[in-house]
Amino acid sequence: VLILGSAGIGKSELALDLVSRGHALVADDSPVLTQQADGRWLGRCLFPLQDFLEVRGLGILNIRRLFGDRAICAEHPLDLVIRLEDAPSRPEDRLAGAWRDYRLGGHAVPELPLTVRGGRNLALLVETAARLRACGAGEGIGYNAGQELSRRLEEHLGKESL
């Protein structure tokens, strides 16, 4: 997951929350993205920056020292982009979500904008987005709960009108 957003919006704090939940950090501010032969992108961190995360108020953290080796991942394919926003960039389809494509070198990566507001559990939303992505969300294929709900309602309403 690549987390994007303006300075100070909470990207590093979200990354720290995800690490505390058992996920691994690839890079903080300067991920190196390399396009593979199949068109997909692979993210990694330059060695001098590896293991470190800067969190406002806490300073520089050595994630490997705080959470162990499992908390650092040397490289990982880019499967999902999360964009943290102060306000929604466009109206959201409440059934399908706000999925869109993040274009990178001619390759589309599913992107999900998340509005940052007090009381939202962003780590849980990112974990759920990753699960949805694994089911094909954001690709125009795969499982879509909104479509299933619409289908069930149409079937139910159709039976009642008979």
Name the predicted role of every residue range.
Residues V1-V26:
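Glycine-rich phosphate-binding P-loop
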Residues G5, G10-E13, C73-V81, E160-S161:
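Short secondary-structure transition/capping segments
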Residues S6, P48, V116-R117:
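A short, sequence-level motif marking secondary-structure junctions
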Residues K11-E13, G22, C45-L46, L61-R64, ...:
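Short, low-complexity, polar/charged sequence segments that are solvent-exposed and flexible
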Residues D17, L25, F47, A74, ...:
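A generic structural signal for short, solvent-exposed coil/turn residues
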Residues A24-D86:
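Conserved nucleotide-sensing/catalytic segment adjacent to the nucleotide-binding pocket
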Residues D79-L162:
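Conserved NTP phosphate-binding and transfer environment spanning the P-loop NTPase/kinase superfamily
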